[in-house]
C-alpha cells in the first residue's frame, strides 16, 4: 500500500493499512516486538556512545596517538557518534510509540544519520585499505603517508558520504519508513513519480558500494601478497613486519565486521529494488536494518581489543594515569616504534 511519503509492501492479513506517521503499526507485528526493538536501540546507545566518545577523548588526550592512521580511525568514531546521537535516539523514541511519531522531518533526520554513518564507515575503510597498500606494498617509491594525506582521506570520506545522503533530502529519491515502520532508509521500494528512485539506487550501489568494496579487495589482495613476499625475503626486521601485520590484521577484521553488518542490509535492499511490488513480512527488512546499526560499536571494540598502545592509553585515562594491568601491556610501545618510523604511521 502506497501513500504520501510511505510504502507498506508487507503481507497483511488484517486488511488495515494506516500511515506510519500517524498511527501505531501494531497490525504488522505484536507490540512486544516494538518494545524489544526499543530495548535493542537502548543497548546500542549505552554501549555505542561511551565507547566511541572514549575513543575520541583518549586520542586527543594522548599526543602519541595523534598519528595519520589514527585520523581515519577517529573519523570512524565520529561517524558512529553521528549514528548514535542523530539516528538511534530517534529510533528508540519512535519504537516506543510503535510508529514514526516524529513525522517526515524525523524520518529524514534518522535516515540521513544512519546512512551517513554507514557511508563514512565504508569510505573510511577504503581509505585505510589504500593507506595500508601504500605503506606496505610501496607502489610509490619514497612516499610517506603523512598528516596532509590523512586529512585528505578524511575529507574524501565525508564528501562521498554527503554525496550519497544529501540527494534524498533535496528530491533525488527520499527517506521513508521501512521494516516495522519505525526507522527510515532510502526508498528502494517504489517508482514514485518525481523522485527518480531507480537512478539514485543504481548510483548509490555502484558509486557508494561497489567502488569502495572493489578498492578494499584490490588493496588487501595486493597487500597480502606483499606481506608474504617480504616475510620470505626478510626485507624488513622481524619487529617491523610483526607490527605491520598486526595493523593489517586489525583493519581487515574491521572490513569483515563491516561486511557482516551491512552486506545483509545491502542484499535485502537490492532484492527489494529488483522485485518492486512483491510482498514480504515486516521483519524481512527490519532485522538486517537494525543488525547493520550494530556497526556503531564493533569498530571501537576491535580497535581497543587489537591495539595494545591504545588500550594502554585508555586504561591509564580511566584509572587516573595508572595502569593496574601494566605487566600485561608491557612492551607494547617498543613493539610498535620501529614500524612507526618505517611506515610514517603508528600501527598501534
From Swiss-Prot:
Q: Where is this site: Plays an important role in the conformation switch to the active conformation?
A: 110
Extracellular side stretches: 1-33, 94-107, 171-199, 272-283
Biological processes per GO annotation: absorption of visible light; G protein-coupled opsin signaling pathway; visual perception
Post-translational modification N6-(retinylidene)lysine, affected residues: 293
Q: Where in the cell is it found?
A: Membrane; Cell projection, Cilium, Photoreceptor outer segment
User: Where is the chain membrane-spanning?
Assistant: 34-58, 71-93, 108-130, 150-170, 200-221, 250-271, 284-305
Output compositional bias ranges, type Low complexity. 332-348
* S-S bridge residues: 107-184
* UniProt record similarity statement: Belongs to the G-protein coupled receptor 1 family. Opsin subfamily.
| This protein's name | Rhodopsin
Originating species? Sargocentron microstoma (Smallmouth squirrelfish)
What is this protein's gene name? rho
Amino acid at each position: 500500500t502506497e501513500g504520501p511519503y510511505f510504502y507498506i509492501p508487507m503481507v497483511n492479513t488484517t486488511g488495515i493499512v494506516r500511515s506510519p506517521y500517524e498511527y501505531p503499526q501494531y497490525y504488522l507485528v505484536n507490540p512486544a516486538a516494538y518494545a524489544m526493538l526499543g530495548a535493542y536501540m537502548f543497548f546500542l546507545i549505552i554501549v555505542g556512545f561511551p565507547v566511541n566518545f572514549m575513543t575520541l577523548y583518549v586520542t586527543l588526550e594522548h599526543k602519541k596517538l595523534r598519528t595519520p592512521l589514527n585520523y581515519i580511525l577517529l573519523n570512524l568514531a565520529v561517524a558512529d557518534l553521528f549514528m548514535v546521537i542523530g539516528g538511534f535516539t530517534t529510533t528508540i523514541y519512535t519504537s516506543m510509540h510503535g510508529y514514526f511519531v516524529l513525522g517526515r522531518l524525523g524520518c529524514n533526520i534518522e535516515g540521513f544519520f544512519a546512512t551517513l554513518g554507514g557511508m563514512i564507515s565504508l569510505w573510511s575503510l577504503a581509505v585505510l585499505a589504500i593507506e595500508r597498500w601504500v605503506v606496505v606494498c610501496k607502489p610509490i617509491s619514497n612516499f610517506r603517508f603523512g598528516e596532509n594525506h590523512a586529512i585528505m582521506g578524511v575529507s574524501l570520506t565525508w564528501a562521498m558520504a554527503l554525496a550519497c545522503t544529501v540527494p534524498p533530502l533535496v528530491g533525488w529519491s527520499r527517506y521513508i519508513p521501512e521494516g516495522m515502520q519505525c526507522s527510515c532508509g532510502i526508498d528502494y521500494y517504489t517508482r514514485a513519480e518525481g523522485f527518480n528512485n531507480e537512478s539514485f539506487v543504481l548510483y548509490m550501489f555502484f558509486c557508494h558500494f561497489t567502488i569502495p568494496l572493489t578498492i578494499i579487495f584490490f588493496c588487501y589482495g595486493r597487500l597480502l601478497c606483499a606481506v608474504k613476499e617480504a616475510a620470505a625475503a626478510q626485507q624488513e626486521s622481524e619487529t617491523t613486519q610483526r607490527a605491520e601485520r598486526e595493523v593489517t590484521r586489525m583493519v581487515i577484521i574491521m572490513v569483515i565486521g563491516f561486511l557482516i553488518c551491512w552486506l545483509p542490509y545491502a542484499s535485502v535492499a537490492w532484492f527489494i529494488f529488483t522485485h518492486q511490488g512483491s510482498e514480504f513480512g515486516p521483519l524481512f527488512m527490519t532485522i538486517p536494518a537494525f543488525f547493520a546499526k550494530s556497526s556503531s560499536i564493533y569498530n571501537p571494540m576491535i580497535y581497543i581489543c587489537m591495539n595494545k598502545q591504545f588500550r594502554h592509553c585508555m586504561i591509564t585515562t580511566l584509572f587516573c594515569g595508572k595502569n593496574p594491568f601494566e605487566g600485561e601491556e608491557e612492551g607494547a610501545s617498543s613493539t610498535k616504534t620501529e614500524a612507526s618510523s618505517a611506515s610514517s604511521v603508528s600501527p598501534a
